Structure formats: structure tokens, C-alpha cells
A protein has these predicted regions:
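Glycine-rich nucleotide phosphate-binding loop and flanking beta-alpha elements
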Residues: 46, 86, 166-170
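N-terminal positively charged helical leader segments and presequences
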Residues: 1-69
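Active-site/ligand-binding-proximal alpha/beta "capping" segment
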Residues: 159-182
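Fold-independent oxyanion-binding glycine-rich loops
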Residues: 8-9, 20-21, 43, 82, ...
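Flexible, charged surface loops at secondary-structure boundaries
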Residues: 33, 151-157, 177-180
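RNA substrate-binding interface of SAM-dependent RNA methyltransferases
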Residues: 70-161
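Glycine/charged-rich beta-loop-alpha catalytic/anionic-binding loops adjacent to active sites
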Residues: 16-18, 73-77, 179-182
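A short acidic, often aromatic-flanked loop/helix-cap motif at beta-alpha or helix-coil junctions
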Residues: 11-12, 144-151, 167-169
Length: 182
């Protein structure tokens, strides 16, 4: 089943065009033809659609009906120091699949990689959302300092700090204790 993120407003009986990139994907990569079905989604839900035609502007689709409402997702943020591209891509993909709502790249004293390609990260987030059957697409913040992040962190939120050298209070133990609490 082909699922595509659709940033425009979606409603039944709407006729719209896919982007050129999405049109290339459905026509040339997935080889969908006129009359084939696909799904489009945004933060409001998921709709079934049919390809009406391939045009210069892109594939023209008709939205048929809503098949799924938006999900009630937990407000999970993932703050991380920028790292090299391949491990960063992995973090973004898996975080999206696991339900992260916001990615926050943090600059600290020991951060080696000082910038990330936000446009590329957004593309990875959309692709991971499409593949993992999510309705929402997580946000990616601009780089910020650790001090700024901590000053804006919600007072009623839980903050888990992961340290590769920590042996006693590892993430598994902390989360299992939290689940056991009423």
C-alpha cells in the first residue's frame, strides 16, 4: 500500500496534484497507473485516493474517503547532539517510527558536528512517517544550546538523560520503575 504525506488540506471529493517528486515515485518507481489507489495523510488523518491522470504539474488524484482519524500520540521529544550523517539518519528514522513528536538538535561543549541539514532531516522524517504508518509527521527544531533547551523544557515533563558510560541507572531500569508507578 502506497502512503504519501500531503501537506495541503485533505477532504473527501477533493481533486489535487501530487508534487513532482511524489508523482515520480508513484509513476516511475512504484509503477502505479491511472485508476490505481493510494493513501494520503496529514496530521488530521488518512484518506484513500485514486490516480485520475498524470499531467505536467504532477499526478492528479481524487480524494475518496477518510479511512483513519488522527492518533492520540504522546508528546515525546528527542534531544540529541548532532553526529555524522548515517548515524543521524538512523536516529531520525527510528525515533519517528517509535513515536517521537519533536527532534531537538543540541549543541554542547563537546559537540563535534556543529550543523545538520534540516531540509534533509525533514525529508527523512516524512519518509519514515510514510513507511511506519504514522499519521503525524514530527517536527525538527533548529540547533540550540543545551542551556537554552533546559531553560525551555516543560516543568512537568520527564527528562531522561542517556550516558553511554552509565551502568547503574540505565534506561531500561528507569523506564521499568516508571511503568510500575501508579
Amino acid at each position: 500500500k502506497i502512503r504519501l504525506y500531503f501537506s495541503d488540506k485533505i477532504q473527501s471529493d477533493l481533486v489535487s496534484h501530487l508534487t513532482k517528486e511524489q508523482s515520480h515515485y508513484v509513476k516511475d518507481v512504484m509503477r502505479l497507473e491511472k485508476g490505481d489507489y493510494l493513501s494520503v495523510f496529514n496530521a488530521q488523518g488518512e484518506w484513500s485516493a485514486i490516480i485520475e491522470n498524470y499531467e505536467k504539474e504532477g499526478a492528479r488524484i481524487k480524494i475518496l474517503k477518510k479511512v483513519r482519524d488522527k492518533d492520540n500520540e504522546k508528546n515525546i521529544w528527542l534531544a540529541f547532539s548532532p553526529i555524522k550523517q548515517n548515524p543521524l539518519n538512523f536516529i531520525i528514522q527510528k525515533g519517528t517510527e517509535l513515536g517521537v513528536q519533536k527532534f531537538i538538535p543540541i549543541l554542547s561543549e563537546r559537540t563535534i558536528v556543529k550543523e545538520i541539514n534540516i531540509t534533509r532531516v525533514k525529508k527523512i522524517i516524512v519518509e519514515a512517517s510514510e513507511q511506519s504508518n504514522r499519521i503525524s509527521v514530527p517536527e525538527i527544531n533548529n540547533l540550540e544550546t543545551l542551556k537554552n533547551f533546559l531553560s525551555q523544557f516543560p516543568k512537568n515533563g520527564y527528562l531522561l538523560f542517556c550516558d553511554i558510560n552509565c551502568e547503574k541507572n540505565n534506561l531500561k531500569n528507569i523506564l521499568s520503575k516508571k511503568i510500575e508507578e501508579p
